[in-house]
Amino acid sequence: MVVYLVGAGPGDPELITLKAVNVLKKADVVLYDKPANEEILKYAEGAKLIYVGKQAGHHYKSQNEINTLLVEEAKENDLVVRLKGGDPFVFGRGGEEILALVEEGIDFELVPGVTSAIGVPTTIGLPVTHRGVATSFTVVTGHEDPTKCKKQVGWDFKADTIVILMGIGNLAENTAEIMKHKDPETPVCVIENGTMEGQRIITGTLENIAGKDIKPPALVVLEMLSMFLKK
């Protein structure tokens, strides 16, 4: 028995890796999230498909339930795929699932995916680094675990470009915190449904972006913008 944690990429089914496709074709069982484009499941023909539905604020199953289910399916099948949107280790809680497998002595392999933090800005021609302008970037969650005793995100980032994932529900709160450290006129770009049908680009500033009509899934990019979005 072996479990593959597979990254499905940022949304466009053509952005999944060849290795991910090959693993899906051999799968006995696939546990998949909502962020993983369901069109990708066509590669798992004949496999048992289990929807575990993890979205911010709308969890069909809790993380503990997913861990338990993953272990149970692994013990009953030769090859189980845990399909996750983006990359399993970029705010995908893949590490928690690996620890659950290790505790039960279950073998696993990892298949990286294209993270939306880079893939989505690239799709619209917005680089997160650029020679002479941006030599660093930070990827941060905009939705910390509400059960934490203390928040870890301080928002005083020194990177030239900041990419915020899962941040639309807390956009007003997050931008207010960022404005304690950055100019309110700092340019902001939000990309809805990145790489997928219905992709939409919304631009503004730290001061006004939260007032725009924005719906998840979407990511937020700060600063590395002006010279590219005008083209």
Curated annotation (Swiss-Prot):
A molecular-function term among this protein's GO annotations: uroporphyrin-III C-methyltransferase activity
Keyword S-adenosyl-L-methionine recorded: yes
Keyword annotations of the record: Cobalamin biosynthesis, Methyltransferase, Porphyrin biosynthesis, S-adenosyl-L-methionine, Transferase
PROSITE patterns: SUMT_1, SUMT_2
Disulphide bridges: none
Regulation: Does not show substrate inhibition at uroporphyrinogen III concentrations of up to 20 uM, in contrast to SUMT from Sinorhizobium (previously believed to be P.denitrificans).
Reaction(s) catalysed by this chain's protein: uroporphyrinogen III + 2 S-adenosyl-L-methionine = precorrin-2 + 2 S-adenosyl-L-homocysteine + H(+); uroporphyrinogen III + S-adenosyl-L-methionine = precorrin-1 + S-adenosyl-L-homocysteine + H(+); precorrin-1 + S-adenosyl-L-methionine = precorrin-2 + S-adenosyl-L-homocysteine
Residues reported in the UniProt entry to bind S-adenosyl-L-homocysteine: 10, 85-87, 115-116, 166, 218
Pathway(s) where this gene product acts: Cofactor biosynthesis; adenosylcobalamin biosynthesis; precorrin-2 from uroporphyrinogen III: step 1/1
Any Pfam family hit: TP_methylase
UniProt EC number: 2.1.1.107
GO biological process: cobalamin biosynthetic process; methylation; siroheme biosynthetic process
Alphabetical list of InterPro entries matching this protein: 4pyrrol_Mease (IPR000878), 4pyrrol_Methylase_sf (IPR035996), 4pyrrole_Mease_sub1 (IPR014777), 4pyrrole_Mease_sub2 (IPR014776), CobA/CysG_C (IPR006366), Siro_Cobalamin_biosynth (IPR050161), Uropor_MeTrfase_CS (IPR003043)
UniProt keyword Methyltransferase present: yes
Database matches in NCBIfam families: cobA_cysG_Cterm, PRK06136.1
Physiological role: It is a step in the biosynthesis of both cobalamin (vitamin B12) and coenzyme F430.
Family in the record: Belongs to the precorrin methyltransferase family.
Subunit structure: Homodimer.
Protein name (database record): Uroporphyrinogen-III C-methyltransferase
